[in-house]
Amino acid sequence: MAAPGEALTPQGYIQHHLTNLHVGEGFWTWHIDSLFFSVGLGVLFLWIFRSVGKKATSGVPGKLQCFIEMIVEFVDNSVKESFHGRNALIAPLALTIFMWVFMMNFMDMIPVDWLPWLASLAGIPYLKVVPTTDVNITFSLAIGVFVLIIYYSIKVKGVSGFVKELTLQPFNHKAMIPVNLLLETVTLIAKPISLALRLFGNLYAGELIFILIALMYGTNLLLSSLGVTLQLGWLIFHILVITLQAFIFMMLTIVYLSMAHEDH
């Protein structure tokens, strides 16, 4: 499926599915589809958990309540095992990150042509439905975590303690302050960059594989049949990938914030 005036070639098909619906140019470009799906899924997550929380009973819970309680307990145990400070906000934050990232990743399970085709009927030429295949979204999440790291580092250790952490580690000598500052600054900045690029790279690669498999349906009968098998196999494997990436993002956030709460 291609946008109007776009050649229906393998290259055009791939390019079409990797192009965001956007307004503006350069630095001021807004990816409308990424914003729509990320915000929409965030609202959906809040609505589901709030609804279940309001209807929760101490008696025999329903299937959805059981599922939500399993997730909450899993995240709570992960926080207890990895976070060594005192902060009541870390568990809710970890739950939000895990569920939000997972739900954005889960959009990759929808066949690549379905939603773009529906959008084309409404006159929308491009539509990327997986927010985490947009590096702007993954960096936004990572920068949010980075801001929390800086905030809690200063709150727990004070400005002087935070500066000492950057200048007197790993070599505790005044002569090594420039070296320490360089090493610690690089380490600090690498945290959000690695968070963002790891999530983006894995989901972008997964989406690209789905697109390449979808191309096989437009060839001969043999490759079309093979495409069905490949898509099913990759779909099953990708469920593990999207869950693992959400878990890794959550766990690294917990670990980084735990380090920020350590007062040496």
UniProtKB/Swiss-Prot annotation:
InterPro entries: ATP_syn_F0_a_bact/chloroplast (IPR045082), ATP_synth_F0_asu (IPR000568), ATP_synth_F0_asu_AS (IPR023011), F0_ATP_A_sf (IPR035908). It is found in: Cell inner membrane. SUPFAM superfamilies: F1F0 ATP synthase subunit A. It holds the Pfam family ATP-synt_A. It is a multi-pass membrane protein. GO terms for biological process: proton motive force-driven plasma membrane ATP synthesis. GO terms for cellular component: plasma membrane; proton-transporting ATP synthase complex. Gene3D superfamilies: ATP synthase, F0 complex, subunit A. Its main location: membrane. The chain crosses the membrane at residues 29-49, 90-110, 134-154, 177-197, 208-228, 235-255. The keyword Ion transport applies. CDD domains: ATP-synt_Fo_a_6 (cd00310). One of its GO terms (molecular function) is proton-transporting ATP synthase activity, rotational mechanism. It comes from the Bacteria. Keywords: ATP synthesis, Cell inner membrane, Cell membrane, CF(0), Hydrogen ion transport, Ion transport, Membrane, Transmembrane, Transmembrane helix, Transport. The keyword Membrane applies. Key component of the proton channel; it plays a direct role in the translocation of protons across the membrane. Belongs to the ATPase A chain family. F-type ATPases have 2 components, CF(1) - the catalytic core - and CF(0) - the membrane proton channel. CF(1) has five subunits: alpha(3), beta(3), gamma(1), delta(1), epsilon(1). CF(0) has three main subunits: a(1), b(2) and c(9-12). The alpha and beta chains form an alternating ring which encloses part of the gamma chain. CF(1) is attached to CF(0) by a central stalk formed by the gamma and epsilon chains, while a peripheral stalk is formed by the delta and b chains. This is ATP synthase subunit a. It comes from Shewanella oneidensis (strain ATCC 700550 / JCM 31522 / CIP 106686 / LMG 19005 / NCIMB 14063 / MR-1). The gene is atpB.
